[in-house]
């Protein structure tokens, strides 16, 4: 714990300077970001980030420069800083070391990020899951709460050493929900909805300098339409950061492979001022970079854990500790 506090004390001034410099000289600052990323000890993760930024630096017409300018013009820098440190150091560096050690010790898969479905009625269950997950080195969480509750906001607030991506409906964004997150800096909200709902939500989020993204769903039937240029352009108005693509139900391997390769292609082309992420495939890719595994897990509101290593057996975290559930997925 002391070592982690010391590491944060060393990293935080570098992040502060980097964010300050981004406003004045994005291109030069990005070169400093490259140096900072390479200073992190997790080589596999650093090298992949380095490759992405190098492509950006060699492309003078990259839309990612527009992305950066949009971020620094509206976003609360404390929000970006807290989320980045928690994700970059606590989750992907310090926590990842614990994950690798416990994974070897127990000969099981432990994910770098845990997806959790929740609502007001299941907040105690969610809080307990996160408590157990942190003991395993997991400090990155994707929380799915369609109608954001005060209980969910409080869970994110008290776990301020973690990074949260909160997936919710755009219709849930209101003065009330924005006020609930007024002092919470370790969260990225991702919204989904109709054009009118997205327009209203993004206006409110920008006005309040919130860190947010947008997400959309795909399945075997509509996966090809995800990459239509008209649709890619459509999302430009509703995110300054990420476009998260999420499978709606069990997709065929063909669909998953198609999404993986084409999402990477969109990122490499750098034509749109957001970063496209395929939640399923990119979660696995990052997991492999960080832990050497290829594992993802989601826990539904009933406490059932599902993973990409499914064998048809259901395991419930209300019947046994999280680690014991993960031990069911032997390497």
Predicted regions mapped to residue ranges:
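Extended hydrophobic/Leu-rich segments
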Residues: 102, 255-256, 326
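Conserved C-terminal portion of the radical SAM core fold
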Residues: 118, 140, 199-306
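N-terminal [4Fe-4S]-dependent radical SAM core
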Residues: 43-115
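A short acidic, amphipathic alpha-helical/loop segment
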Residues: 128-132, 151-156, 175-180, 197-205, ...
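Accessory C-terminal segments flanking Radical SAM cores
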Residues: 1-31, 35-47, 263-331
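N-terminal start-of-chain detector that recognizes signal peptides
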Residues: 85-91, 138, 160-163, 269-271
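Core AdoMet radical
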Residues: 112-124, 133-149, 159-174, 180-197, ...
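Solvent-exposed, charged interface segments at domain starts and junctions
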Residues: 9-38, 113, 199-219, 223-227
């Amino acid at each position: 714990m002391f070592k982690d506090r010391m590491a944060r004390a060393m990293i935080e001034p570098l992040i502060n300077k980097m964010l300050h410099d981004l406003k004045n000289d994005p291109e030069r600052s990005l070169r400093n970001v490259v140096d900072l990323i390479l200073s992190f000890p997790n080589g596999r993760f650093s090298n992949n980030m380095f490759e992405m930024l190098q492509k950006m630096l060699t492309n003078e017409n990259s839309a990612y420069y527009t992305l950066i300018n949009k971020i620094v013009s509206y976003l609360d820098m404390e929000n970006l800083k807290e989320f980045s440190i928690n994700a970059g150091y606590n989750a992907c560096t310090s926590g990842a070391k614990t994950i690798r050690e416990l994974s070897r010790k127990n000969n099981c898969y432990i994910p770098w990020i845990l997806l959790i479905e929740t609502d007001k009625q299941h907040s105690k269950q969610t809080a307990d899951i996160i408590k157990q997950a942190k003991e395993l080195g997991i400090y990155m969480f994707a929380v799915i709460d369609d109608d954001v509750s005060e209980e969910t906001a409080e869970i994110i607030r008290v776990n301020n050493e973690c990074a949260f991506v909160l997936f919710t409906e755009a219709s849930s964004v209101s003065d009330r929900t924005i006020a609930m997150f007024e002092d919470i800096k370790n969260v990225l909200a991702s919204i989904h909805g109709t054009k009118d709902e997205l327009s209203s939500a993004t206006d409110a989020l920008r006005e309040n300098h919130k860190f947010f993204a947008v997400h959309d769903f795909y399945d075997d039937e509509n996966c090809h339409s995800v990459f239509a240029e008209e649709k890619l352009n459509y999302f430009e108005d509703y995110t300054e950061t990420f476009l998260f693509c999420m499978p709606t139900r069990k997709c065929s391997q063909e669909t998953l492979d198609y999404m993986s390769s084409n999402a990477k292609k969109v990122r490499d082309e750098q034509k749109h001022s957001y970063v496209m992420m395929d939640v399923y495939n990119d979660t696995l890719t990052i997991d492999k970079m960080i832990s050497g595994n290829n594992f993802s897990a989601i826990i539904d509101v009933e406490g059932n854990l599902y993973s990409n290593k499914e064998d048809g057996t259901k395991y419930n975290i209300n019947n046994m500790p999280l680690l014991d559930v993960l031990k069911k997925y032997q390497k």
